[in-house]
Amino acid sequence: VGGVVIAIILLPVLAVIGVMSNGVQGASDALVHVNEQTHEIEVRTFSGDLITTLTASTTWPIKGVITQEFGVPNPPYQIAHSGIDIDGGFGKPVTVFMQGKVLHAGNFLAGCGDNCVEVDHGYGIDSIYAHMSAHNVQVGQSVKPGDVIGLEGAEGWASGAHLHFEIQVRGVPVNPRSFMVGNPDKG
């Protein structure tokens, strides 16, 4: 019985390790399936079970230029980048991409500085907005696409002003582009 309990506890961990051996893009592809024609997103478990179906957002958190893509090694650390970096200009407003509730606001994540925000969108989907110069939301606050949650900055482990935009499914980083339509080009 003890061996069965250990196997049940370790099964999700082993699934994550197996998928992660294919890299962060492999994990992202396993959890999020996108229909490029309809912009419909299927969010799944590592075992392939459907969690929910969504429509991709057109509300990028900031207009700007992508300076680093998801999964690309991040110098000087040489680990895969867990989000997308967007440079829209220091002090520009940062908005939430999808309806949700603020889970964390402040310094809760190593390297993000004092003005990070994490939003719980339900279905195990969270988004993180890091390196901001200020945040203006409180834990438990409801937010919707377009609501300003902070300002672009260079807080924490940042080489310059930008927004680090990360989406996680059940705690695993996935490619934010899977949830977005188009590009965050400056208007």
Segments the model singles out, each with a brief description of its role:
Residues 64, 82-84, 115-117, 147, ...:
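Extracytoplasmic/periplasmic beta-strand context in beta-sandwich domains
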Residues 91-92, 107-110, 154-157, 168:
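Short polar/acidic secondary-structure junctions
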Residues 79-81, 96-136, 161-163:
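Zn2+-dependent peptidoglycan hydrolase active-site motif and core
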Residues 65-96, 169:
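Short glycine/threonine/proline-enriched tight-turn/helix- or strand-capping micro-motif at secondary-structure
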Residues 86, 115-119, 144-156:
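Short hydrophobic beta/alpha edge segments that flank linear recognition/processing sites
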Residues 93-104, 137-152:
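Short, well-structured beta-strand-loop connectors
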Residues 2-71, 187:
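Polar/charged, compositionally biased leader and regulatory segments
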Residues 87, 134-147, 166-187:
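Acidic, glycine-rich catalytic/binding loops that coordinate metals and/or anionic ligands
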